[in-house]
Amino acid sequence: MHVALYARVSTTRQADNDLSIPDQLRQLREWAAANGHLVIQEYVEPGASATDDKRPVFQQMISDAMMKPAAFEVIVIHSLSRFFRDGIEFGVYERKLAKNKVKVVSIT
């Protein structure tokens, strides 16, 4: 399966608490390899809050996922909070992506 990885931190405090972008990417890559997936793209967003969708890298990833055909089949994230803090907003994007047969998978 073709997958995209999305890693994000909002603060340097998070980076110091074992949620650094390199740590997230390492875990995401290991998960993808262990599950036989091919990583097509890595999206990295340092210093961006997940309280809204005004994140340039996030928007590029969504745009790539909505291409016909989609650039990848799955967006892999470390935890749901890396994608969105708000469950309603998460659901909106999850449904939007599902219409183009793209899933969001959290490894934790």
Please name every model-derived segment.
Residues 1-108:
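Short, structured surface patches at the beginning of a domain
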